[in-house]
Regions:
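Positively charged, low-complexity intrinsically disordered leader regions
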Residues: 2-8, 280-287
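N-terminal glycine-rich phosphate-binding loop and ensuing alpha1 helix
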Residues: 2-80, 106, 142-146
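Residues at the starts of beta-strands that form the adenosine-phosphate
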Residues: 7, 52-54, 100, 127, ...
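Structural beta-sheet core signal
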Residues: 10, 56, 130, 159-160, ...
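Alpha-helix/helix-capping structural signal
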Residues: 14, 60, 135, 142, ...
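Conserved beta-strand scaffold positions in the cores of enzyme catalytic domains, especially
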Residues: 30, 101-103, 157, 246-248, ...
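Conserved beta-loop-beta/alpha segment of the NTase-like Rossmann-fold superfamily
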Residues: 74-78, 91-177, 211-213, 219-222
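Catalytic-core segments of class I nucleotidyltransferases/pyrophosphorylases
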Residues: 129, 148-152, 181-284
Length: 290
């Protein structure tokens, strides 16, 4: 029986330069999709998958994330005075329980692998999930919950994957495939942002992982890889070399790349159309522009 996945790491230290000037004074992860910030969707997904402890790897200028997941007593009192108990209940229901959240700093932006390494003291000796808020997942069963179910069968390390055009493989970590049953893929290696002509497949990793704690040893000794950064995929490759299984899961649902402006807009439209109050009005607005 595999150790359960109870902890999740949220790397939120990035500068969000692609969204300037909006992100000059606001963390990218706090940009709203309809009525919730990006990071909230990721935390809700983790809660739905059974995660009990939430670790945020932050940097300077990210205090709005801390505030978002804290109590706002003045706001709560105002809502009570105005009889908006339904809004208050919704806010409280979305908060993790006291003691479930912790924060650590990534003082220098050295890449995703380094950000994950910064959480080593919080994670300890347990498997853990990593969720990148840039990837907003729209799934009937939450993406991470699908991954946890798969992990209970496979053990080892696991990532959510998508298939992309070969020309786009240079943007992702790409799997070197051993076997593929149509949903679960076993990999013999992972290549970070390869030349498309040399990519071992077109199956690429997106921002959802379940990882074994042994990765911290490799991240501690890692040399900068692609882009001069400490790459998480390089350390995952070391675990594969040591005999740990690595699988990719074709999740059921849609992924929106909200680190890209068009992806952000698409997510806003898609979730807006699904919103029970806003959907009909948004359809009317969109039809006026098409």
């Amino acid at each position: 029986m595999h150790k359960p996945v109870r902890k999740a790491v949220f790397p939120v230290a990035g500068l969000g330069t692609r969204f300037l000037p909006a992100t000059k004074a606001m963390p990218k992860e706090m940009l709203p999709i309809v009525d919730k910030p990006l990071i909230h969707y990721a935390v809700e997904e983790a809660k739905a998958a059974g995660i009990e402890q939430f670790f945020f790897v932050t940097s300077r200028g990210k205090s709005a994330i801390d505030d978002h997941f804290d109590r706002a007593y003045e706001l709560e009192a105002t809502l009570r005075e105005r009889g908006k108990e339904d809004v208050l209940e919704e806010l409280e229901a979305r908060l993790p329980e006291p003691g479930q959240i912790a924060y650590t700093r990534q003082q220098t932006p050295l890449g995703l692998g380094h950000a994950v390494w910064c959480a080593r003291g919080l994670v300890g000796d347990e498997p853990f999930a990593v969720l990148l808020a840039d990837d907003l997942m729209l799934c009937e069963q939450p993406c991470l919950a699908q991954m946890v179910e798969a992990y209970e069968r496979t053990g080892g390390n696991l990532a959510a994957i998508i298939e992309v055009p070969r020309a786009h493989t240079s943007r992702y970590g790409v799997l070197d495939v051993v076997s593929d049953d149509g949903r679960l893929v076993r990999a013999r290696g992972v290549v970070e942002k390869p030349d498309p002509a040399e990519a071992p497949s077109t199956l690429t990793i997106i921002g959802r992982y379940i990882i074994q704690p042994e990765i911290f040893g490799h991240l501690s000794n890692a040399e900068p890889g692609s882009g001069g950064e400490i790459q998480l995929t390089d350390a995952l490759g070391k675990l594969i070399d040591e005999g740990q299984a690595f699988h990719g899961l074709r999740f059921e649902g849609r992924r929106f790349d909200c680190g890209d402006k068009l992806g952000f807009l698409e997510a806003t439209v898609a979730l807006g159309l699904q919103h029970p109050e806003l959907g009909p009005g948004l359809r009317d607005i969109l039809s006026a522009y098409l």
